[in-house]
Amino acid sequence: MARAKRERPSLMDAEGTMAVMQIPGHDHQKPREVTLEEIRAVLGDCQLCPLGQTRTNLVFGVGNPHARVMFIGEGPGRNEDLQGEPFVGAAGQKLNSLLGLAGLRREDIYIANVIKCRPPSNRNPQPDEITACSPFLREQIRSIWPDVIVCLGNFATQFVLRTEMGVTKLRGQLYQTGHFTVMPTFHPAATIYHSDWLPLLENDMRMLGQWLADHPVQE
């Protein structure tokens, strides 16, 4: 007997506004009056995991310290490792081209990664590496205190939403976890090799833009 097809949650609620799925976790998070510069100073020449021995540069993060939208990726690639800044390679160029779909510019957002040092040969981050690095990402989030966190790819999605599910099952929907509205979507680099994912990523960026339009900053 064929399994009944599971209905995907509607993106609109009964009042016609964008629906957001509630996810437990982060409920007790509060913003911290600590600057990104202070967090970076604590990191210093971090050697908390073996990646500190193989990196060229620690890639902390870059962007607007008061951003409404924070993008979180997986980890630095070769270009990021060389330049010390996230999303400067092909994935960064792809991301820049997509931001306009959400009504955003690069200077509007903040970008960081789950880990801050490039894994050798761009392999996936190891659990101990994520464990060592994650407290600093949490402090960045609490310092910026964005309205929306955009998770690019599986590792960011699983870290923020505390799930083992992959982004392909979770994208296309907004999630609320504590203060934060979270949007999982594909990593821009993945669309370079999976061109059929690009329209889905574009749709997600439009969804982000709609949410921002529906939730303007209160003066």
Segment roles from a protein language model:
Residues 2-219:
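A polyanion-binding, active-site-adjacent surface
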